[in-house]
UniProtKB/Swiss-Prot annotation:
The lineage of its organism: Bacteria, Pseudomonadati, Pseudomonadota, Gammaproteobacteria, Enterobacterales. This is Crossover junction endodeoxyribonuclease RuvC. Its EC number is 3.1.21.10. Mg(2+) 2 binds at residue 67. Mg(2+) 1 binds at residues 8, 139.
Amino acid sequence: MSIILGIDPGSRVTGYGVIRQVGRQLTYLGSGCIRTKVDDLPSRLKLIYAGVTEIITQFQPDYFAIEQVFMAKNADSALKLGQARGVAIVAAVNQDLPVFEYAARQVKQTVVGIGSAEKSQVQHMVRTLLKLPANPQADAADALAIAITHCHVSQNAMQMSDSRLNLARGRLR
């Protein structure tokens, strides 16, 4: 059993999603958004750090998964996004959580089956995969999708490792 915290970073709205994985079974534990309504960036970063730390304390995840920075058209926005990611990662590392990063395209490909999927498609598939009564908020859905991606990637890595081990055992006999 593993608990995974997914984070969709943003300097104004940071989405989070928490799921439990038991084998191939995924269970929704919680999700939401950390909203920073103050204007100055240092105060927003402090709120993101405090919010992520509080979520980690509440859910006690085993793994921390976050979206990678993408190339934005606006350099200022990309820098702010990078700083928001940074404080979220520091919050995880301060709690000794292993950090995993996934590209947005990989997350969409894993959850929807199309790397260029729309936000509404991600919301719908997250709702379906986690058997939720309604679509989660967009940023929370993205965070849950990141957590789901981590589950699938880690599950596939374990299967590949088992296959290699079995292949090696077959050669030794």
